[in-house]
């Protein structure tokens, strides 16, 4: 019942945490969610943070998850993975940078349907078009280059545009009234990837495995730029690697778009 009351079964996660008896140094939570991601992550994080355990993974487009051979709708499936031979650490990669001259206050939002109505009191669609000089039809591909970012302290949560709805924009994650947003632009993504790999190597000279989630839009962007195979080759240098392409990425209590999240095992 994640769409209406994700907290209803939180005791199951609390019991599993006691059984695993892990810590932030050796345990990670990997989850797959069927919807209402932001609320689900906030709920799960309330239990995980007591032991400072990180969470990564994401969501797809089918609105279903599978666990132990059964398919569930309106649910979240998770696994608590404890590394018995070393540490674990999670990472989030952002290949965009803020356009500081384009900051906005969101309004006329529809939290349930992820609608962004206005930016600084003007049509969200028109503002986006005017700044980037694109047609309405081009908006859905321009978001690969220029998504929005929600400012969260020193961090930025990326927000992708899903579709145009009249003068509004429908996004892939929730936007609330009075949220502070900034328009983002594509950075030197090859350099960002190299920096991520260097950070992982510095933290884990001998990693045993990596599990990652890449956004579908990152996959499309890398493919269009002829970089996808090079990206996979560079990441494979870290060792054994498994992962998936998703519709939205999870990182602790954050539901983000157009990102890569991963967990590395020592």
Question: Across the structure, where does each feature detected by a protein language model lie?
Answer:
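Hydrophobic alpha/beta core scaffold segments
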Residues: 1-266
